Swiss-Prot record:
Gene: avrRxv
Organism: Xanthomonas euvesicatoria
Family, as annotated: Belongs to the acetyltransferase YopJ family.
UniProt-annotated binding residues for CoA: H180, K239, S240, H308, S309, R310, R311
InterPro entries: Ser/Thr_acetyltransferase, YopJ-like
Region described as Disordered: spans on this chain: 29-89
Higher taxonomy: Bacteria, Pseudomonadati, Pseudomonadota, Gammaproteobacteria, Lysobacterales
Catalytic-site annotation from UniProt: H180, E200, C244
Basic and acidic residues bias: start-end ranges: 79-89
Name the UniProt record assigns to this protein: Serine/threonine-protein acetyltransferase AvrRxv
Function: Serine/threonine-protein acetyltransferase translocated into infected cells, which mediates acetylation of serine and threonine residues of host target proteins. Induces a hypersensitive response (HR) in tomato cv. Hawaii 7998 (S.lycopersicum) carrying the resistance gene.
Location in the cell: Secreted
Root EC class: transferase
Amino acid sequence: MCDSIRVQFRSIQKMVVKMKKFFRSLGVGGSSSSRFQHHIPEADSAPSSKASTPPASPPPDSPPSNSAFSALPTRPRKKAEALSDAVESRGHLAPPSLVSYANATLDQLRRNEPISESLRLMDIENLPHLVRSYDNRLNNLNLRSFDTPGQFLHDLSRWHKTGLPLRAVVRLDEDPRRWHRVAFDVRNHESGHTTIIALEPASAYNPDHMPGFVKMRENLTSQFGRKISFAVIEAEALKSIGGCVIFSLDYALAAYQERSTFDQWHKDLRKKGNIKGMTPESQHLNELGVYLLKGTRLLPANFYKHAHSRRTIDELEADQPGASGTDVRSGRAAVYKESLSRRLEEFQVQRDKTYSMSIEASRARKIRHALES
């Protein structure tokens, strides 16, 4: 009986050895095999100490949610949902006008429609709230908003004496029928000279805009004499009526983000009267004291992340090869690289025309920041 059991046991051992050899031949098992080892997803793995840049692109978009903003592409939908959450959690602590502004923005995003005139007016009314939230958060930003050119000129005299930089969103024309806003980046130099770089998100050649720049230059000369230099950079990223308030706020913040570049431009403007040796777009305007430059020739790619049109990105790429592939992600929470081309695709909507709604998502984000600050 015992002999019979031993024979059966040896037979089983031989069978096990044969099975192991068979599986090894398939690459399964053994210390060197990895085909069936447990896989740890990258997102759950500890980050590499050598990692300095984010992955090139995010995973595929999640399927449309059942939220009230499901008509929007994934990226702007998430920003709308984040604003909606902020209204619910922080709205009772915020100024009523800011809450109404947030709700009007959410309503526009929910309908997935172009910006209305009433929302543009709310941009103007609530701009001080948005400006304050950023100025309180960013060191030495010195961001202000001005409802008239006269208010800006009056306050500029005070800043002129401090020697501090100033960034501002300024209404370009005294005419109450004209709402257009632009961003001003200002440096007050030790020599007593002041340099101003105006950032026009649309076209400075627009007949409704250029008279404001010429008049501003005249008033600056009257106030400061020869101790003032004034440049205008037209980005032509804004292609729709309205939107200038949020665009200009974004440009003031972008100038702060790119302040080392702007510091050098201001030095050039003070010492040489030009920026990077670039010739003005219009000799006639230059004779009037308005040094006009084309934005696609020199502005960093970050200034075009909210551009409405593919054509604008193509022009930027033609003037600055490689710019359309530049990583323009922002914020501490940014995980993936984001090129201008990819952003244009991810924020594209089809309404009366096909264009990027990135600036609308930026409005939602800026309002959320104001609610949470």
